[in-house]
From Swiss-Prot:
Record PTM N-acetylalanine, positions in chain: 2
Record protein name field: Chloride intracellular channel protein 4
Short motif (G-site): ranges: 35-38
Reactions that this protein is recorded to catalyse: chloride(in) = chloride(out); thiocyanate(in) = thiocyanate(out); nitrate(in) = nitrate(out); iodide(out) = iodide(in)
General function of this protein: In the soluble state, catalyzes glutaredoxin-like thiol disulfide exchange reactions with reduced glutathione as electron donor. Can insert into membranes and form voltage-dependent multi-ion conductive channels. Membrane insertion seems to be redox-regulated and may occur only under oxidizing conditions. Has alternate cellular functions like a potential role in angiogenesis or in maintaining apical-basolateral membrane polarity during mitosis and cytokinesis. Could also promote endothelial cell proliferation and regulate endothelial morphogenesis (tubulogenesis).
Keywords of the record: Acetylation, Cell junction, Cell membrane, Chloride, Chloride channel, Cytoplasm, Cytoplasmic vesicle, Cytoskeleton, Endoplasmic reticulum, Ion channel, Ion transport, Membrane, Mitochondrion, Nucleus, Oxidoreductase, Phosphoprotein, Transmembrane, Transmembrane helix, Transport, Voltage-gated channel
Activity control note: Channel activity is redox- and pH-regulated. Anion vs cation selectivity is enhanced when fully oxidized.
Residues bearing the modification Phosphotyrosine: 244
Species: Rattus norvegicus
Gene name in the database record: Clic4
Subunit description: Monomer. Interacts with HRH3.
Length: 253
């Protein structure tokens, strides 16, 4: 994908930075692979509205020039005006700092609680899916459900901005589209890729569905699936299943 070069004579701050994102490739070596960290950065750059290019990296056949660019580093990583950056959390902080208003959107959540909502889900899911002992399955599933319930409660609890102090009407349930409001933030870029993996993998290898009664989570996922920033940066369900084919353990007596 070609980058749009800035025109000569523009002020330095008006020039588009040269950004290339390197993400994990799928099983075919070309499509987007299963990597929530790759998707996290992909979503951030897309939401920022900045011009950037994306290169999928086949870990089985990593090209020599990429090994020289970031020796010993697996995707995701970025080059920003030819400077290599490899730490995902630091990349997120850097992009939020340099790609700032008024030219680019601010993506930090307004409510600190949005940053930690759902943070325990992936660890509980990993323990659940890697377990091979039938006698431990029920307790591990309960642990996963408990963390999902906590997220569901957060998504259904009105944020301060949804409550009108002058209104006589008591808002009992939130209708917001995402974690921090009606627009995606950095918190969504972190959680949504992981939540999607949980949904796909738990169904495939444990026949587990996120309960339909968790209306906050299902509203959240439905809204995410309606956004290009999520669906176009997301690996296919098949890629996610392939990635977990050796990780997900069969329950054996």
């Amino acid at each position: 994908m070609a980058l749009s070069m800035p025109l000569n004579g523009l002020k330095e701050e008006d020039k588009e930075p040269l950004i290339e994102l390197f993400v994990k490739a799928g099983s075919d070596g070309e499509s987007i692979g299963n990597c929530p960290f790759s998707q996290r950065l992909f979503m951030i750059l897309w939401l920022k509205g900045v011009v950037f290019s994306v290169t999928t990296v086949d870990l089985k056949r990593k090209p020599a020039h990429l090994q020289n660019l970031a020796p010993g580093t697996h995707p995701p990583f970025i080059t920003f005006n030819s400077e290599v950056k490899t730490d995902v959390n630091k990349i997120e902080e850097f992009l939020e700092e340099v790609l700032c208003p008024p030219k680019y959107l601010k993506l930090s959540p307004k409510h600190p609680e949005s940053n930690t909502a759902g943070m325990d889900i992936f660890a509980k899911f990993s323990a659940y899916i890697k377990n091979s002992r039938p006698e431990a399955n029920e307790a591990l599933e309960r642990g996963l459900l408990k963390t999902l319930q906590k997220l569901d409660e957060y998504l259904n609890s009105p944020l301060p901005g949804e409550i009108d102090e002058n209104s006589m009407e008591d808002i009992k349930s939130s209708t917001r589209r995402f974690l921090d409001g009606d627009e995606m933030t950095l918190a969504d870029c972190n959680l949504l890729p992981k939540l999607h993996i949980v949904k796909v993998v738990a169904k495939k290898y444990r026949n587990f569905d996120i309960p339909k009664g968790m209306t906050g989570i299902w509203r959240y996922l439905t809204n995410a699936y309606s956004r290009d920033e999520f669906t176009n940066t997301c690996p296919s369900d098949k890629e996610v299943e392939i990635a977990y084919s050796d990780v997900a353990k069969r329950l054996t007596k």
